[in-house]
A protein has these predicted regions:
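Residue-level hotspots at or immediately adjacent to binding/recognition sites across diverse folds
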Residues: 2-410
Length: 410
């Protein structure tokens, strides 16, 4: 593990990822139920870049209430990528499991100090599977190695066991040390979409000091594969259920699901039986994610959604002129962050959705930060946001940290 100081202050590949409490009792109002209201004042955000591990592409994917940010950074030369943790002014390189690459790709969230993600081992893929790893890693070594979920705590990285198969993936973790993700079992499923060979199932790992217990989660009746993507401190888990296709995409995401008390529930879709992928869940059980478009099984156009127990599933919409959106993070105030893109994926922008209104986060920046915020990945209960920005002059992509700083009058 290497520490670095920092200053205080993908069209198809995107589709794999991903690769989100009402205030004072107020009722959540959706955009389609009332027109957007323009405030005479609005919150501004002071944005700062986070340091990198030497490469020109980094991203914050998770931020907890202690302002610990985890994600990834390319190494010098941009041929390799490592999971990264930005904590209290220090950038930590979390290393790998013996292979060239690793990443924290989802919003981990817990306050306990556990970081989870995916890492390559030194072992070659025995069945020639891709495990979608080219979606998570750069360069010529992005495939060909066995991938496992990992958990990091206090400088120690541990591999998470599988259900007997070769590969695994960890996405989220709560304060009890319950880690969610998915792993392969031993069944060679003839219905798997090549190059996938083995079925994979959603799991919860109970991480103890001396042992890790793996618990498989049930699928929707008739489904064969699935993945768990996020967990809250009440033990509610969200994820996907479908067939042995791309995790976490396409027909593996036939159903967006919620697990609680040992049961699985289909939370619905926006009209398509594919790409229905929850990405985050808050303590109230509100869920955000993205869903497929009817007639588009390749996932060229996705739509951000929010699901609540009382309101069901609703689309969040897109920014003006855009057709594509994802929701990646949600806090207890039901503030949602994500990205919105035009049809050509040339203009992608981070957004903040609140009380039924989606705002371009770039319009809420305090003066002095020139880079474009192109993807917001997570938001904590203080309203602090992390994601990725792009410098318009150099093209460098950097992880950012956005902090609410006050109100600007208009």
């Amino acid at each position: 593990m290497t520490a670095h100081t920092f200053d205080a202050g993908c069209k198809n590949w995107i589709l794999f990822l991903i690769i989100v409490i009402a205030c004072c009792g107020a009722t959540l109002v959706f955009a389609q139920n009332r027109p957007a209201q323009v405030n005479t004042s609005e919150r501004l955000y002071r944005v700062s870049d986070l340091d990198s591990l030497g490469g020109t592409n980094s991203r914050g994917n998770s931020i907890n209430n202690r302002a610990w940010i985890s994600g990834y950074s390319n190494l010098a030369g941009n041929q390799r990528r490592h999971a990264a943790l930005w904590r209290n002014g220090i950038l930590f390189d979390l290393g790998t499991l013996g292979g060239p690459n690793s990443s924290v790709t989802w919003n981990v969230k817990n306050e306990r100090g556990l970081i989870v993600g995916i890492a390559q081992t030194a072992l070659p893929q025995p069945l020639g599977e891709a495990w979608s790893s080219a979606a998570f890693y750069p360069g010529p070594l992005n495939t060909g190695f066995v991938n496992l979920g990992f958990v990091w705590e206090n400088g120690l990285t541990r591999a998470l066991p599988t259900l007997g198969g070769d590969n695994g993936f960890a996405t989220g973790c709560n304060n009890a040390g319950h880690v969610v993700g998915w792993t392969e079992n031993t069944f060679h499923d003839p219905e798997c979409v090549a190059p996938q060979v083995l079925q994979f199932r959603p799991v919860v790992w109970e991480v103890g000091r001396n042992e890790i217990v793996t618990n498989e989660l049930p699928l929707i009746a008739g489904d064969t594969s699935g993945a768990a993507t996020a967990i809250n401190n009440h033990g509610q888990v969200v994820g996907i259920s479908g067939i042995c296709d791309q995790a976490v995409g396409r027909h593996t995401a036939k159903h967006a699901v919620l697990w609680q008390n040992g049961s699985v529930t289909d939370i619905g879709d926006l009209g398509a039986p594919f790409w229905n992928t929850p990405t985050a869940i808050n303590e109230r059980g509100d869920v955000v994610g993205f869903a497929g478009t009817p007639g588009d099984p390749d996932g060229n156009i996705l739509h951000a959604f929010i699901w609540t127990k009382d309101g069901g599933i609703r689309p969040l919409g897109e920014l003006p002129g855009h057709v594509y959106s994802e929701a990646s993070g949600i806090n207890e105030r039901r503030q949602v962050v994500g990205l919105s893109c035009d049809a050509d994926f040339v203009d992608c922008r981070a957004y903040l959705w609140e009380n039924g209104v989606m705002r371009d986060l770039n319009d809420l920046k305090a003066p002095g930060y020139p880079a474009r915020l192109d993807n917001a990945k997570d938001i904590n209960d203080k309203g602090e946001i992390t994601g990725r920005s792009t410098d318009p002059n150099t093209g460098m992509r950097k992880a950012f940290f956005a902090t609410p700083v006050g109100v600007s009058a208009h």
